[in-house]
């Protein structure tokens, strides 16, 4: 279980509080327009997102991981070479849809942080799409099963994730409802679905 700032030793309780706290922070990113002050398409920008979301829960928020990690028998970039990999990703082009998704896939393979990579990187991807092609993803249109399978295959076959994302693009780039539904969908991909973004916003 991950060491946390909340002093929680129960993994179920930690997951619950992590979702509540970080989803609330994700809402704040949109409402306060803080997101618009972050770098677009760089690891620095991704780190800024991750730090903002997770700084109340984990000491490692925004910091490059020092451990090797894997998921479903897939080993992400070695911690030893992670900084070098991130430098290469920073230099990847992002001027059109294909380039942007290819960059996103590489950032996912890097998996820069100990926890919270997917949720942070999907926000990062939307920032690039918005900045470069005036679109964002309506994540609520992509099912959890389709997304996870396509991302699992993406290092060797990116056509599936490109197809899913292209079909979910919208020009409602500043739409509150698209963002809120997207946050809920993004968290659901990772198994966090106890809280609804709309309800959390209304409580604050």
Regions flagged by a language model, labelled:
Residues 1-204:
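FIC/Doc superfamily catalytic core
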């Amino acid at each position: 279980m991950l060491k946390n700032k909340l002093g929680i030793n129960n993994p179920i309780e930690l997951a619950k509080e992590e979702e509540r706290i970080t989803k609330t922070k994700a809402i704040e990113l949109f409402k306060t327009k803080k997101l618009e002050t972050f770098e677009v398409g760089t690891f620095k920008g991704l780190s800024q997102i991750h730090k903002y979301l997770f700084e109340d829960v984990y000491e490692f928020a925004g910091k490059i991981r020092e451990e090797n990690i894997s998921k479903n028998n897939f080993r992400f970039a070695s911690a030893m070479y992670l900084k070098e990999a991130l430098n290469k990703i920073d230099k990847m082009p992002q001027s059109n849809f294909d380039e942007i998704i290819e960059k996103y896939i590489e950032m996912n393979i890097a998996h820069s942080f100990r926890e919270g990579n997917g949720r942070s990187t999907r926000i990062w991807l939307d920032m690039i799409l918005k900045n470069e092609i005036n679109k964002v993803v309506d994540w609520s249109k992509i099912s959890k099963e389709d997304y996870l399978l396509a991302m699992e295959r993406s290092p060797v076959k990116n056509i599936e994730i490109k197809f899913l994302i292209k079909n979910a693009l919208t020009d409602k780039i500043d739409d509150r409802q698209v963002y809120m539904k997207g946050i809920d969908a993004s968290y659901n991909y990772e198994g966090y679905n106890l809280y609804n973004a709309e309800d959390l916003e209304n409580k604050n």
